[in-house]
Amino acid sequence: MAASVPEPRLLLLLLLLLPPLPPVTSASDRPRGANPVNPDKLLVITVATAETEGYRRFLQSAEFFNYTVRTLGLGQEWRGGDVARTVGGGQKVRWLKKEMEKYASQEDMIIMFVDSYDVILASSPTELLKKFVQSGSHLLFSAESFCWPDWGLAEQYPEVGVGKRFLNSGGFIGFAPTIHRIVRQWKYKDDDDDQLFYTQLYLDPGLREKLKLSLDHKSRIFQNLNGALDEVVLKFDQNRVRIRNVAYDTLPVVVHGNGPTKLQLNYLGNYVPNGWTPQGGCGFCNLNRRTLPGGQPPPRVLLAVFVEQPTPFLPRFLQRLLLLDYPPDRISLFLHNNEVYHEPHIADAWPQLQDHFSAVKLVGPEEALSSGEARDMAMDSCRQNPECEFYFSLDADAVLTNPETLRILIEQNRKVIAPMLSRHGKLWSNFWGALSPDEYYARSEDYVELVQRKRVGLWNVPYISQAYVIRGETLRTELPEKEVFSSSDTDPDMAFCRSVRDKGIFLHLSNQHEFGRLLSTSHYDTDHLHPDLWQIFDNPVDWREQYIHENYSRALDGEGLVEQPCPDVYWFPLLTEQMCDELVEEMEHYGQWSGGRHEDSRLAGGYENVPTVDIHMKQVGYEDQWLQLLRTYVGPMTEHLFPGYHTKTRAVMNFVVRYRPDEQPSLRPHHDSSTFTLNVALNHKGVDYEGGGCRFLRYDCRVSSPRKGWALLHPGRLTHYHEGLPTTRGTRYIMVSFVDP
């Protein structure tokens, strides 16, 4: 392909045979008073066959600095070859050749030709023209470290003391007559190589001197990123960001993500020139934004839910779907469940989901679909339906606490967009800021700031997962292939993101709002009867929402919810009814209740002075989780109720006691081996049992009607001598901890 481009001596001969053009004067030759950097004499010419997001990004940067841009090729078929993988690009020269006929005789006209899909302008026309005139060239090409496409030509390049040695055709600037004189010689195929064409002209010493051709060796104007990523850093001003080349201490005007540096350009484009600034924040978050009108029905959405592994708190996730702030008659639900374990949870919620959404489809584990196949099926159902305007993919480990999430993402008006979600208190999130060479996770310089929302905006990232919205039209026109997730051996989300990136579609991430969080699923053990109980470490926020009483925080804040039925005996809400029920069910499922005898092999000494029928938390593997509950919730309440006392919340004895009239109905008077004791009622008096309660003998005071989920907190040894009152009917359960023994 490249061999059809003629030798440089033949090109020189052809150029010498051309009719003479009006002389082109350099800045130093111009009469005094002439303006060598008049922006009105500058035209930026670029090439684009389609209005991709990269092209729009280029135009946004041009508009920010008030450049005049002329685009060649819009709407036309690209015949220039697969330039991302091999040689080609000659079609650009053919288009430019035709366009330059208009400017052939305009001596003061300066043309800058650049690519568009992978280019960002970083400074003003005035700075650009000033630097060009200072170069003393009539035609200045960008430079890079690689002699592409023919390494055999490297020795013919002039030696360079400092800077990049080789020509890159992705950007050049020059006087119009000079550029016209060069491109006029193009008589080759569209898929011949444009860079080889320009290279062979430049390598002829006579031609180089005659036409004053040169390279931007130190990236004063053009910064090609390929081979130079270590040289480039962001330079933050208050209202503007640009890049700095630290190798040459220059501030390039044009940033070109040539070769395999498209993702790095996307990262830089999040900031340059005004994507995000320290003072102004996000500069284009509201660009092209749409507002869903209140009086009209919003777009139709396919909500695709994926339960691909055992997932904590799934019933709460399913109920949260009903709370989306979006008309349910405009949402169709697709739900793929890959876990037999979760079938009862989905069966319980399915009638509500059926009644709520306009249409529903359930694909269960019996279909034996892989995660990728299920995702392909769901996405294609939107793709094939012209009425499907948006596709909302949501994994079961994504906790959307903001009911307006769907509406917010649609109004952002991007082809693909995800809400930023992360695990509570951790840096694990649903996006990657960069990719490693093998396309796995790499941490971008701004990753922590984005996850912690120290920088808030709209970000172009290489990978998203677990929750995202895609335009239906984008699926139908730009992602028409059915197998997007299952097209390779990689993770389905990685395959999807690669497919989107390869199409030139940006993966946007918004952290402008608090959308929710991610669940950790790696330690979810479904061998337990109620595995959610064990999630206090991995998913503490969701655990609290499910298991800590809704009024606990108010009680801790002193809002009058703590009662004192007896001296120094405090009564406050601690656990939800669900936790009480699940604790009891776990104990009964385990079933190995002690016999209420003094001999007890579970204790170090083998003897219990005041025996009860009980099961220790250690026996069911819940000791660590219960101690964490004591540290997190009981400790702060204790220090609030007993000022001046600091608890270490150590507890060796943590157990559930069962009282029955025919088993052990009561407990004789005793002191507890603790500094203070926690006693939580786990079921309802009058419903589950009759009788019961606790009497403090020294004060002749009793708590005879314990409330389910409420905790009694009282001193243990010395002062609060107490007994368990008889249970006369049913079964009474309490949870007891002897704290700080």
Swiss-Prot record:
Keywords from the UniProt entry:
Dioxygenase, Disulfide bond, Endoplasmic reticulum, Glycoprotein, Glycosyltransferase, Iron, Manganese, Membrane, Metal-binding, Multifunctional enzyme, Oxidoreductase, Secreted, Signal, Transferase, Vitamin C
Q: Does Glycoprotein count among this protein's keywords?
A: yes
Could you list the residue ranges that cross the membrane? none
Under Gene3D superfamilies, the record lists: q2cbj1_9rhob like domain
Positions annotated with a glycan in the UniProt record: N66, N551
Q: Where in the cell is it found?
A: Rough endoplasmic reticulum; Endoplasmic reticulum lumen; Endoplasmic reticulum membrane; Secreted
Q: Where on this chain does Fe cation bind?
A: H670, D672, H722
Which is one GO molecular function term here? metal ion binding
The record's region (Accessory region) falls at 298-523
Annotated Gene Ontology cellular component terms: collagen-containing extracellular matrix; endoplasmic reticulum; endoplasmic reticulum lumen; endoplasmic reticulum membrane; extracellular space; Golgi apparatus; rough endoplasmic reticulum; trans-Golgi network
Binding of 2-oxoglutarate: at which residues?
R602, Y659, N679, R732
Q: Which domain of life is it from?
A: Eukaryota
Which residues are in the Fe2OG dioxygenase domain? 650-741
Record-linked Pfam families: 2OG-FeII_Oxy, GT_PLOD, OGFOD2-like
Q: Among the record's GO biological process terms, what is one?
A: vasodilation
How does the UniProt record describe the way this protein sits in the membrane? Peripheral membrane protein
**Region named Required for glycosyltransferase activity:** 28-293
Q: Which CDD domains match?
A: GT_LH3 (cd23002)
Ligand binding (Mn(2+)): D115, D118, H256
Quaternary data: Homodimer.
Chain's role: Multifunctional enzyme that catalyzes a series of post-translational modifications on Lys residues in procollagen. Plays a redundant role in catalyzing the formation of hydroxylysine residues in -Xaa-Lys-Gly- sequences in collagens. Plays a redundant role in catalyzing the transfer of galactose onto hydroxylysine groups, giving rise to galactosyl 5-hydroxylysine. Has an essential role by catalyzing the subsequent transfer of glucose moieties, giving rise to 1,2-glucosylgalactosyl-5-hydroxylysine residues.
- The name under which this protein is listed is Multifunctional procollagen lysine hydroxylase and glycosyltransferase LH3
Q: Which organism is it from?
A: Rattus norvegicus (Rat)
Identify the taxonomic lineage of the organism of origin. Eukaryota, Metazoa, Chordata, Craniata, Vertebrata
